[in-house]
Amino acid sequence: MDYERQQHAPIYEALERFRKKRVVPFDVPGHKRGRGNPELAQLLGEKCVGLDVNSMKPLDNLCHPVSVIREAEELAADAFGAAHAFLMVGGTTSAVQSMILSVCKAGDKIILPRNVHKSAINALVLCGAIPVYVNPEVNAQLGISLGMEVSQVEKAMDENPDAVAVLVNNPTYYGICSDLRTIVKKAHARGMKVLADEAHGTHLYFGRNLPVSGMAAGADMAAVSMHKSGGSLTQSSLLLLNKSMNAEKVRQIINLTQTTSASY
């Protein structure tokens, strides 16, 4: 990680430069940086609403970033050890769905745990992929589902050699992690992609003596919820890619469903 470069916040710095120019707004959003909705400005503060602006050349565009947003994504990729990172504003729901839509088409099989998040199920509805469920065991004392065992995943792969991907919760809602490294190794040996739902695993990238993160384990893609445990505002998330994925194709998939009016 380039620690010196990580000291920069390119999007925020661009927003501050723009705010100081005191440009009169004749575009969206309708609150006109607080002037059109003083109640909102009083609630959130003038500085906050003053930074809620429309996409424009000095501030880049999330759908096709070429300057400050692109630099921010490069910084995120560097920090998380990924080949590429996408800033997501539709929560990790949009990141999970983009992962699945990027590797699955109608009729394709994907192996996933039965306690997968509903966003993954909705993605299967959208693309027509076929789920192959693995039923994690349940800890009767705690009353919670555990992670997928390697033997369970391997059995599903042997019975469905035509599956195109395996999705792993890393960790589950209750903090349970599977042996992700081994699952990645066995899936890749069969030509299958590995997708990591890390909605509750942001800390795995930065803490010591913690389970392995998706990128470190060699997963092809990982959906990381920055707002859940990373300290950012609600709905902010990251979609991480390893070198095995085509970033331009994934960008196109993201743009199919992500808003064109992203909030800064």
Go through each PLM region and give its residues.
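Conserved PLP-enzyme active-site core in the AAT-like
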Residues: 3-5, 11-16, 20, 40-43, ...
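Generic preference for hydrophobic/aromatic residues in regular secondary structure cores
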Residues: 15, 25-30, 85-86
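Residue-level detector of solvent-exposed, low-hydrophobicity positions
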Residues: 19, 25, 31-35, 70, ...
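A short, flexible N-terminal coil/short beta segment enriched in small residues
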Residues: 24-31, 50, 56, 99-110
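Conserved oxyanion/phosphate-binding beta-strand-loop segments in alpha/beta enzyme cores
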Residues: 27-47
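Conserved N-terminal alpha-helix of the aminotransferase class I/II PLP-enzyme fold
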Residues: 48-94
